[in-house]
Amino acid sequence: MKCHYEALGVRRDASEEELKKAYRKLALKWHPDKNLDNAAEAAEQFKLIQAAYDVLSDPQERAWYDNHREALLKGGLDGEYQDDSLDLLHYFTVTCYSGYGDDEKGFYTVYRNVFEMIAKEELESALEEDMEDFPTFGDSQSDYDTVVHPFYAYWQSFCTQKNFAWKEEYDTRQASNRWEKRAMEKENKKIRDKARKEKNELVRQLVAFIRKRDRRVQAHRKLVEEQNAEKARKAEAMRRQQKLKQAKLAEQYREQSWMAVADLEKELREMEAQYEKQFGDGSGEDEAEDQELRDGQDGKDSDEAEDAELYDGLYCPACDKSFKTEKAMRNHEKSKKHREMVALLKQQLEEEEANFSGPQTDENSLNANSEEEMEDAPKQKLSRKQKKKKQKPAQNYDDNFNENGIGEGVKIDPEDTNLNQNSAKESEDSLQENVGVTETVELCDDPKTEAKSVSKPKGKKAKDTKKSVRVPAEPQTMSDVLISCTTCHSEFPSRNKLFDHLKATGHARAPSSSTSLNSVTNSRNKKEKRKNR
């Protein structure tokens, strides 16, 4: 049987256009009508050309033919196939060659011919795009790097290009349906893969058998061992030299000054002293705290000592701020905000002095109270009600006095300045019985001075001022108070004495005095309720 590709004169990877052109050309050449002189031969050749084109023009027929081409050419698929490939089992013995020379029966000549035949069979089975160059075995004088090593590198991983289609058991063209055809193809594929694997293993085993007896490989292995031994000796000698060199360097080594720990500690202490001198004795505070903890001193004493050191000369009472350096303190004193706070604090102190100081208060007590208030003022906050009470205490008293038309003939007694709640209740009960008693409280300062409104900053500054400045809300202390009877003008040191006098004499019928006393006591009771809130 002749190959279809050879009958059409095309390659095995020819396209449909190439097949069509080749078929038309050969059909015109071998058509019987154009070969009347040799009609029989032309008719036979024309049948082969037509049969080849019928198979190769159909994609499915062409694929099946490509898979079974070798089996069809060598006997068909009916079991009559004769495999004429080289039997490699005969070359697994030492009797197939004699000696390691380059003669006809020598080791290198025999196995060189074997691998050339295997390469030829592979080229016949492979497609043109899969064809590759097979490295040759060489001879006894071949170089290891250029011939021997490439040969064994390729053939030790050899994979055949044969498809072993003649090993198939089923003809897929005889299948009745596609499921049966797929099952046949699956079984045939298993058989082909098994045969291909056996072929690859057989060739690789032959390569291993030859390599073990190849004297070129043995000579190269010996050379490599000698080179490795020489490298090991050189490496050992170099290691010893390096070790001796390191030992000499260790003997000559001297610690540098900058590596000494003692010098580092000394330098660290100097740096700490410098920072302590520049930024204050912060480290001294830590040492003092540690010492106090070790000695078991009281925590309050240590806090007071720290506060005294912290606020000693570097504290602004107006702004309630502390500073680490004098320079920062001076910069703060020059700021606009500090000046505003100082001015506001002075105004607050003046108001407090005007509201709470009595006529007999000496300058020493006034200065002491002012200093205490300056220290406490930034830390306190005022509510809206307290601010109103602070601004208009004297005005309420003046209004009460002016409404009732009294106050000119009332005398002030210095003994009864602080009134308790019991006396207030008694006076309220007695006033309900129409007791005619007048009581007038006069403050030390001029009412005009008290009535003046203090200028305050507006906007955000006013809010900051309210937050930073806080005036203690204390009950207003009255100056000396004198209690007398409006009927007989008798003076009494206390209310109890006055009440006894009124009950005994019946002088509690004066209608004009009850109104004024009610207004005074009512205003005082309102203030007491506000303070109790």
Swiss-Prot record:
Keywords: Chaperone, Cytoplasm, Metal-binding, Nucleus, Phosphoprotein, Repeat, Zinc, Zinc-finger
Modified residues annotated as Phosphoserine in this record: 283, 302, 370, 512
Tagged with keyword Calcium: no
Any GO CC annotation of this UniProt entry: cytoplasm
Main location: cytoplasm
Region feature Disordered, mapped onto this chain: 278-311, 327-473, 503-533
Protein name from the UniProt record: DnaJ homolog subfamily C member 21
Residue ranges constituting the J domain according to the UniProt record: 3-70
Biased composition (Basic and acidic residues): 291-302
Chain intervals with Polar residues compositional bias: 357-369, 393-403
Biased composition (Low complexity): 512-523
Domain of life: Eukaryota
Biased composition (Basic residues): 381-392, 455-464, 524-533
MF term (GO), any: zinc ion binding
Cited function: May act as a co-chaperone for HSP70. May play a role in ribosomal RNA (rRNA) biogenesis, possibly in the maturation of the 60S subunit. Binds the precursor 45S rRNA.
Annotated localization: Cytoplasm; Nucleus; Nucleus, Nucleolus
ZnF endpoints (C2H2-type): 315-339, 484-508
Subunit details: Interacts with HSPA8, PA2G4 and ZNF622.
